Amino acid sequence: MKTFALIGGSGYIAPRHVEAIKHVGGDLIAVLDPYDGIGYIDKHFPNASYFKETERFDRHLDRLTRKGKAVDYIIICSPNYLHDSHIRLGLRYSDNVICEKPLVLKHEHLESLRALEVGNKKIYTILQLRLHPIIQKLKEEWREGWT
């Protein structure tokens, strides 16, 4: 079973990630969010450790890694301006970081993240709202206007 940690567990898009983790048979073992709106996650993963402070979350992931129980995937659902630092945190403790778009706000940050993808370390991006009905309608209207 693959293990997951989630940064930004109380955000708008987080429930979709929680459902996806459950759908693939994964186990959400750690969640970071400064707001304690975690009831949804408790319902699906009652044993997940919850942290309000980044430092404690960092320490928890470090402890798991030293015990040989490193997290398989770290998912970033935090506000856009935090993506860069959260991706860096994720790559310290996992080979796989999944981040909603945009990965970063500045091009030079993208280049520095690319340099961190060494060995098995990978950063994946998700277009989390691409199937949202409003986005689909906008896409359809755009196509109709250009055909």
Regions of interest found by a model, annotated:
Residues 28, 71-74, 147:
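Local beta-strand N-terminus motif with an aromatic residue
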Residues 41-48, 112-118:
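Short, conserved SAM-binding/catalytic segment
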Residues 49-114:
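Beta-loop-alpha module in the N-terminal Rossmann-like domain of NAD(P)-dependent dehydrogenases
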